[in-house]
Amino acid sequence: MKILSSVKEDQLSQLDALANALLATMKTEAPVVHDEKKIEPNAMFKLSYGLFVLTADGEKDNGCIINTVTQITDSPKRISIAVNKANYTHDLILKSGTFNVSILDTNADFALFTRFGFQSGREANKFEGLESVARSENGLMYLTEMSNAFLSGKVIQTLDYGTHTVFIADVTEAKVLESAPSMTYAYYFDHVKPKPNNLTTPHGWVCKICGYIYEGDELPADYICPLCKHGAEDFERV
C-alpha cells in the first residue's frame, strides 16, 4: 500500500481503523508457559559462572557483585553483562553507559563479597576505607588486589529481560593484574562462603538460588536476598 498524497487531519481516524484491521489479521503467538515440575532447580547450578565486581559512577563511585560476564566477539573486543535491576549499579550504567569489570581471583575473601554484595550503594559508600583500587582511563574504579584482570566497557546496546538488563559493550581497556586463577561460583561456595553452624533445630532460612543464610525464625515477606536479589519465595527453612 502506498500513500500518494499528504494525509489530511480528518483522514487520521481512517488510517487508524485501517491499521487496526490489518493488525487483527496478524497471528500472534501465545506466550509459552513451561511446566515448572519439569525444571529441576539444581540442574541450573551445574552451569559454570565466574564472579566479578562491576563498578560504575554516578554521584559517587559504586559497585556490585555479578556472575554473568561473557565475551561475544574477538574483533572488535565485545562483551555482555547481565545486571539485576534492583542494583544501584544498574541504574548508574543506564545513565552513564560505561562500566568496569574486575575479574575476581581465588584470593578474594568473604569481606570483599560482604562489601560489594551485602549492602546497597544507595545507602552505603562501598569504597570507604578500601585502598586496593585505582582508576582506569574511563575514570572508573577497579580492584588492584583479589582480581586478576579488569575490563572497561562502553555500552552500545541494552536488552530488557524483566528482572535483569543485558548490556552489550565494546571493551575500551583491559589489563592483566595477577596470575591467580579466576574465582568461580563453585569455588566461592566451597572455599570462601562461611559454612552455617550445625544446629539440630531450624534457625533460619536459606536462599535456594545462591545459598545465602538469613538468620531468624521468621522471614519478612518482602525480604530480598542481598547476594542474588531473589525474593522471599526462593527461600526455604533450614
Residue ranges and their predicted role:
Residues 1-32:
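FMN-binding flavodoxin-like domain, especially the glycine-rich phosphate-binding loop
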Residues 1-7, 208-211, 226-229:
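Short, exposed beta-strand "edge-strand" segments with a Pro/Gly-rich flavor and a Y/T-containing core
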Residues 228-238:
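Short Cys/His-rich micro-motifs in 6-15 aa windows
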Residues 28-209, 214-216, 224, 233-234:
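Basic, polyanion-binding surface patches
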Residues 16-23, 123-126, 237:
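Short, structured secondary-structure boundary patches
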